[in-house]
Amino acid sequence: MSARLPLLVLALAQLVVALDFNIVYVALPAIGTDLGFAEHDLQWVVSAYVVTTGGFLLLGGRAADLLGRRRTFVVAASVYAVSSLVGGFSVAPGALIAVRAVQGIGGALLFPATVSLINTIYAEGPDRNRALAVWGAAGAGGLCFGSLLGGVLVEEFGWPSVFFVSVPLAAAVAWAGWVLFPTDVPPVAARSFDLAGALTGTAGITLLVFLLVRAPEAGWVNPSVLVSAVLSVALLALFTVVETRSRDPLVPGRLFGHRGLVAPIAVTAVYSATFSSLPYFLTLYFQEVRGYGALATGLAFLVPAVVVAVGTQAGERAVAAVGVHRTLAGGMALGATGAAVLGLALTPHGSYPLLLPGIVLVGLGQGAAWTCIWIAAGAGVAPDEQGVASGITSTGLQIGGAVGLAVLVALAGAIGRHPAGGPSAAGLRTAVFAIAAGIACGVPLAHAVRRTPAAS
């Protein structure tokens, strides 16, 4: 069997995850009107997905190692298909929020299973690097076409169509994964499932992500935020104790002594706090400052998505030439420069062409850095721990993104408010400049990533 067929399925899975996450944003106003959401509750159509995804990633990664990568992948894609179908038929706010929470669990199972499949099907080196670049480009495509496709579907067929479109894609991914991926091989040594670690770790991280999502809207002294903070700290402390005493911990402690994993986790958190927050502020700029509609906003993200996809491919080639750590540092430096240039162009009367130089620089740096992060995170990790390694790294991705967006939204709002309700143009510029500074902080972290020979 050609190695290209499994990669096609893995790339399609990443496209589905990215598409499903982004496509809902454009549909939110229609969903709110049709289902009668209170204004302050509508954000939970997105937040429910974010909270459960972030909370269950560690569990999803370990499930891939213990239960089998193919099995976990197929179950996760099936959960996506079924929950998307149910979501399209939702008739009440609570039902749709519950469906999105289930979709988030599906994503938490699917993402680490996908990464660990890449890292075990393709040998470390050029083959794996190339596969990760293709996978990353598919994710960039999903993020872009989510906005564009969402605008078209909502205008032509109504908001349920943004859920229905994922059903055949996710079902096809599940079927193809079962047919094409290698049969799961039982672990060489019998392992027990760390139930106590799974419960305390999943609950603690879920509450942590919840408070980070909830606090910017409700306030940091809101009772639900304070209770979540106390419980999260207590559960994560208990999780640490449980893990040190477990014979087969959910997260093997030796992984944190593995330089090739720890440094990418730190860079991933910075990456998500900065690069991943940028589309939020660009969307506000396009819609509230410049007055773009949903479809025009989707079209505005075409160029960034294409450039990010190009950056993922360029990153893979640069790794072969100069190594992972240099390419990652270069990508972060390029992204920081681009974000600074972009911030200068975010004026009340600016035009889209003025944004393009910054968009191109940011996109190239973002794409190259994304490929490098996952190359580094899987390097030198044993095959039977690839799932939990990707789960740990992707948990850093989720927590970093939640922290970064919360801080940046507060910063932008403190500078000034737009009449439409969001931050003013000055506030958006300040947030983007802060993003540039944050990305720059990732450059020295990138140099701590495990060195690889340029030709490997």
Identify the function of each model-found stretch.
Residues 83-87, 183-185, 222, 390:
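Short linear Ser/Thr-Pro motifs
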Residues 3-26, 39, 223-231, 235, ...:
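12-transmembrane solute porter fold
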Residues 112, 134, 139-151, 205, ...:
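Glycine/proline-centered helix-kink
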Residues 1-179, 322, 328-330, 340-343, ...:
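Transmembrane-helix bundle of Major Facilitator Superfamily
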Residues 31-32, 63-64, 149-157, 212, ...:
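Interfacial helix-cap and linker-helix signal at transmembrane-aqueous boundaries
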Residues 133, 155-268, 274, 292-293, ...:
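Hydrophobic transmembrane-helix bundles of small-molecule transporters
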Residues 55, 109, 203-206, 277, ...:
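Residue-level signal for the membrane-embedded core of alpha-helical transmembrane segments
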